[in-house]
Amino acid sequence: MAGAKEIRTKIASVKSTQKITKAMEMVAASKMRKTQERMSSSRPYSETIRNVISHVSKATIGYKHPFLVDREVKKVGMIVVSTDRGLCGGLNVNLFKTVLNEMKEWKEKDVSVQLSLIGSKSINFFQSLGIKILTQDSGIGDTPSVEQLIGSVNSMIDAYKKGEVDVVYLVYNKFINTMSQKPVLEKLIPLPELDNDELGERKQVWDYIYEPDAKVLLDNLLVRYLESQVYQAAVENLASEQAARMVAMKAATDNAGNLINELQLVYNKARQASITNELNEIVAGAAAI
């Protein structure tokens, strides 16, 4: 059994770690609430612009934008949004498993996959596997902006226009609630067509005159929509990161508390044994006299 002094040192060390994990838990909780607000405020924009695109595309009779037309898939592009930091449980691991499983399915169909990575964790992981990376961005921080993400979006848009990829997917962790975050894979280009229920009550083509031209408007709207989708994914992934970190740090704090209790019992036993030995020595000495 370890000595009382050694056990006291261990207890002090665990208590110090417990303070750090508790502080990290509180910081993550605060950041998660702020990110949730940004996430909620950005969703209506994405949904509305998607509806506008659907109506405008129906107004351009005889014109089909390339982003709205399905192709035969021979090459796939994926924009993968991960975290820049760790200590968030299995969040990134589950995300990477989703990407690798999808890549495996495409490989079995003899389809190549290119990745555009956002977040240092995904960059480090996929570089270590030697997978072809089209673009990479990291360090977006706790308040991501469209300007920080536009490089990944534009690279995939250019690749799609040039025929270097035939379909583009967006992969990120979707925030369900504080205890649940789910890796999702969503089709980004070509855009899935909205059904009548998603369009709402206004199912008819808008009878508007577009200036300068509906095609020009549609081109701009589609790019803005793709940017907003990647931004939304980055914000959702950030909220998922903070929630996962908060849960992980709470578990670490609780485990530290349990370990302290166990060490305290060991310390008490060691101290009791030490006192008992001292008493035995005193009694033995008195008997010898």
Curated annotation (Swiss-Prot):
Signal peptide: none annotated. The keyword Cell inner membrane applies. GO terms for cellular component: plasma membrane; proton-transporting ATP synthase complex. It comes from the Bacteria. It is found in: Cell inner membrane. InterPro entries: ATP_synth_F1_ATPase_gsu, ATP_synth_F1_gsu, ATP_synth_F1_gsu_CS. CDD domains: F1-ATPase_gamma. Its main location: membrane. It is a peripheral membrane protein. Pfam families: ATP-synt. GO terms for biological process: proton motive force-driven plasma membrane ATP synthesis. Keywords: ATP synthesis, Cell inner membrane, Cell membrane, CF(1), Hydrogen ion transport, Ion transport, Membrane, Transport. GO terms for molecular function: ATP binding; proton-transporting ATP synthase activity, rotational mechanism. Produces ATP from ADP in the presence of a proton gradient across the membrane. The gamma chain is believed to be important in regulating ATPase activity and the flow of protons through the CF(0) complex. NCBIfam families: ATPsyn_F1gamma, PRK05621.1-1. Belongs to the ATPase gamma chain family. F-type ATPases have 2 components, CF(1) - the catalytic core - and CF(0) - the membrane proton channel. CF(1) has five subunits: alpha(3), beta(3), gamma(1), delta(1), epsilon(1). CF(0) has three main subunits: a, b and c. This is ATP synthase gamma chain.
